[in-house]
Every structure is written in structure tokens, then in C-alpha cells.
Regions:
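Bilobed periplasmic-binding protein-like "clamshell/Venus-flytrap" ligand-binding domains
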Residues: 15-17, 57-83, 128-135, 182-218
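Conserved structured core elements
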Residues: 7, 11, 24, 44, ...
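Sec-exported extracytoplasmic/periplasmic mature domains
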Residues: 5-23, 35, 55-60, 98-105, ...
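Feature representing long, continuous alpha-helical segments
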Residues: 94, 98, 134-137, 144, ...
Length: 244
């Protein structure tokens, strides 16, 4: 995972798929607008670091096809699953494959219909038998903030619906407990910072780029309340909105 994180070119994901307001992500995954956000190392391509992580994992040489191999001559390869019904996700997967294979990691693309995709990537739809090796995931605003927040439901292997990353690590679970037990914003922020540090160290999931949501409203009104899930059209807006 660490080798992959350094082998990808995030500038290209931002420019090919992002808007004019997109930016390169950090290793802590969650963007700066998130409650409890902590600055972590920016993601950027570093092929020397990626190669060193490959060597540390026992893949120091390449075969005639340009793929890293271990001492037994087995090439480094994994299957990348994506939802064929989401055109952008297929594009992400294709660019990941192109970049990683240029680096020396073989990627087999597995494009599935929505039901088959869910059955390989979700605890609920796989009956707690997730079988994918890696996947292009779509995150919702609600999912990012659900339960303990910071996309943790997608990482936590014990989550009854999501849990795609299948993480059961004790340190990770202890951090989630601290977030859930926080009684003040300060306590939550401290625990959230620990989770982002954990993400950065272990890279269970990798953000390809960060982008912005642009909300349009009538110029005749101001003091809208912005909600991450419902945008401007949310209950709190009706208590804050004023006419100019």
C-alpha cells in the first residue's frame, strides 16, 4: 500500500478528473473542511520511495515485462475492482492501472455490475465475506461523517454495512472508541487527529484528489447554512436565511 501511494501521480488525477478547484490530497485522507482535520503529509509521486518499499517487501528485481518479482520469480500483481456503471470510477481505475504498471506493479481490472461490485466490497451485501483485493470506492458525504466520522465506516472491518478495508487492528479500534466517547469538540479533535495519523502510517485507503462542491443560490438572499449532505436546502437554512 505504501509503495502504491508513492507510485501514483496525483497531479494527473487532479487535472484529468477534478474541477478547477480540485487539489492534491494528504495521506490522512479526509479534506480540510472536515471537523477534526489534521494536516498530514501531502500525497505526491516519489518513485524512489516506492521502489524502496517494494525492495523492503522482497520485490527488488523486475522481469522481462517490467514488473517487480520476488525471490521466487512471482510478479507483484493485484486485482482492482470497480463499478462498471460509474464511468468516472472506471476512468480512475484505468489511470491507476496505467501508472502502476509503468512503475512495475501489475494491475488486473475487474469491472462489475453494481450488485456484483457490492457483493465483493461491502459487509452487508457480501454477508461479511468481502473478497476484493482493492477497489475504487465511492464515498458519500453522509458516509464520511457517519458513526465516528472521517470515513471510518469504510475502513472498520466490524461495520455491519461497509467495512471494505477490513481493518480489525486494535490500535485503530481504540481510536474509534476514543472518538465515539468524546464529550467535547476538543476531545473529538484529538482522537480524530490520531485516526488521521493512523491512516497516514498504514494507508488503508488512498484519496486520489480532493475537490470542491459549488452551491448556487439567488443573489437576493444571504446567510445560508451549508450542510455537507443537503447543501443549502436544509432545515437550518430556513432559520438563518435573510433577504438582502
Amino acid at each position: 500500500r505504501l509503495a502504491v501511494s508513492y507510485a501514483l501521480d496525483y497531479d494527473s488525477f487532479r487535472t484529468v478528473f477534478g474541477s478547477a478547484y480540485a487539489s492534491n490530497p494528504n495521506r490522512g485522507f479526509v479534506p480540510p473542511v472536515t471537523v477534526g482535520y489534521k494536516e498530514t503529509e501531502a500525497l505526491g509521486q516519489d518513485l524512489d520511495k516506492a521502489a524502496q518499499y517494494m525492495a523492503d517487501a522482497g520485490y527488488a528485481e523486475k522481469n522481462a515485462d517490467g514488473f517487480y518479482v520476488n525471490a521466487d520469480g512471482e510478479s507483484c500483481a493485484f486485482t482492482l475492482t470497480c463499478n462498471a456503471g460509474k464511468e468516472a470510477h472506471v476512468g480512475y481505475a484505468e489511470l491507476v492501472k496505467t501508472q502502476l504498471e509503468q512503475f512495475g506493479i501489475q494491475v488486473v481490472l475487474e469491472t462489475l455490475d453494481a450488485d456484483s461490485y457490492n457483493a465483493k466490497t461491502s459487509n452487508k451485501f457480501s454477508e461479511n465475506n468481502i473478497t476484493m483485493e482493492a477497489a475504487i470506492y465511492g464515498y458519500t458525504a453522509a458516509g464520511m461523517g457517519m458513526k465516528n466520522g472521517l470515513a471510518s465506516i469504510y475502513v472498520d472491518g466490524t461495520h455491519p454495512v461497509q467495512g471494505g478495508c477490513q481493518v480489525f487492528d486494535e490500535e485503530f479500534q481504540a481510536i474509534l472508541s476514543a472518538m465515539g466517547e468524546a464529550k467535547t469538540v476538543e476531545e473529538y479533535t484529538a482522537a480524530a487527529g490520531s485516526l488521521q495519523d493512523w491512516y497516514a502510517a498504514h494507508m488503508p485507503l488512498i484519496a486520489l484528489y480532493w475537490d470542491s462542491q459549488i452551491l448556487v443560490h439567488s443573489a437576493a438572499y444571504e446567510n445560508f447554512t451549508v450542510d455537507a449532505v443537503f447543501g443549502l436546502n436544509n432545515a437550518n437554512t430556513w432559520f438563518s436565511i435573510t433577504a438582502k
